[in-house]
């Protein structure tokens, strides 16, 4: 056993790695459950949208309402799971920092450096996945809570029995919802166009750079390009002189008549 390996064992490297692998396994399980919870929120949001459109149509056409729309969950399990995952990510970050200090104090080998980099990559992947799922769930919950407020408006309408202002509010809500969907489509198209233009710009820049490098590497080609440019300039001057002479000849001919 090498001296570097002994130093790593004495500094607790293997113990830290075991703890890191355990937390990584726990994170994998909890992130999977968290993603399934996000999928349930997606289904709930879709049901709310469909129910909202059905209720709105009934109110505007016949005045009949059915308030049996689904409710938004309390979110306790969602919030608890989110806090657990956040805590595990912070612990894994601390362990990775400890592993880095441990490896640095014992002259790490290539194998140790690769293992440390792998643990960092896993932490980065889990962090990005957690942020993505969290953002989706928050967005869906906000959307669902907004749509669930329609039930309150409908209940007030049934209690009052009047067509205004409840119906007007529902109409405005439907108009706003349609406008938001249209704006989202326009923004998506603009982002796609921007990405295409950016890729084309990068492609043209690469081509220009390659041509320049080719000219620098091969003087013969650079000289040939220069000759073509000079010939083009000479042809342009000759053509300009011919046009000027013809114009002058026409002016003299017109004045002499």
Swiss-Prot record:
A Pfam family recorded for this sequence: V-SNARE_C
Transmembrane regions listed in the UniProt entry: 236-256
Annotated coiled-coil segments of the chain: 113-147
Keyword Transport included in the entry's annotation: yes
Residue ranges that the UniProt entry lists as topological domain Vesicular: 257
UniProt-annotated location(s): Golgi apparatus membrane; Endoplasmic reticulum membrane
Principal location: Golgi
GO CC list: cis-Golgi network; endoplasmic reticulum membrane; endosome; Golgi apparatus; Golgi membrane; plant-type vacuole; trans-Golgi network
Keyword S-adenosyl-L-methionine carried by entry: no
Biological process, per Gene Ontology: endoplasmic reticulum to Golgi vesicle-mediated transport; protein transport
Signal sequence coordinates: none
Parts of the chain on the Cytoplasmic side: 1-235
Bilayer disposition of the protein: Single-pass type IV membrane protein
Keywords recorded for this protein, A-Z: Coiled coil, Endoplasmic reticulum, ER-Golgi transport, Golgi apparatus, Membrane, Phosphoprotein, Protein transport, Transmembrane, Transmembrane helix, Transport
Family: Belongs to the GOSR1 family.
Assembly behavior: Component of several multiprotein Golgi SNARE complexes.
Function text: Involved in transport from the ER to the Golgi apparatus as well as in intra-Golgi transport. It belongs to a super-family of proteins called t-SNAREs or soluble NSF (N-ethylmaleimide-sensitive factor) attachment protein receptor.
Protein name: Golgi SNAP receptor complex member 1-2
Organism of provenance: Arabidopsis thaliana
Encoding gene, per UniProt annotation: GOS12
């Amino acid at each position: 056993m090498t001296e570097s390996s002994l130093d790593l064992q004495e500094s607790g490297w293997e113990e830290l790695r075991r703890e890191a692998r355990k937390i990584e396994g726990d994170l994998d399980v909890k992130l999977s459950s968290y993603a399934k919870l996000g999928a349930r929120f997606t289904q709930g949001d879709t049901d709310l949208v469909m129910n909202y459109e059905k209720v709105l149509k009934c109110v505007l056409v016949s005045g009949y309402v059915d308030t049996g729309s689904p409710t938004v969950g309390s979110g306790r399990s969602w919030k608890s799971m989110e806090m657990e995952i956040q805590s595990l990510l912070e612990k894994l970050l601390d362990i990775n920092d400890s592993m880095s200090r441990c490896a640095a104090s014992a002259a790490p080998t290539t194998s140790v450096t690769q293992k440390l980099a792998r643990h960092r990559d896993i932490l980065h992947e889990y962090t990005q996945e957690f942020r993505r799922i969290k953002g989706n769930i928050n967005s869906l919950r906000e959307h669902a809570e907004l749509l669930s407020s329609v039930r309150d408006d409908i209940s007030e309408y049934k209690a009052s029995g009047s067509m205004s202002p409840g119906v007007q509010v529902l109409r405005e809500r439907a108009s706003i919802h349609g406008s938001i969907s249209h704006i989202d489509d326009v923004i998506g198209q603009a982002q796609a166009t921007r990405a295409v233009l950016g890729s084309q710009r990068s492609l043209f820049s690469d081509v220009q750079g390659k041509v320049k490098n080719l000219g620098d590497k091969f003087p013969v080609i650079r000289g040939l390009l220069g000759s073509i440019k000079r010939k083009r300039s000479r042809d342009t001057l000759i053509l300009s002189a011919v046009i000027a002479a013809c114009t002058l000849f026409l002016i003299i001919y017109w004045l002499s008549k």
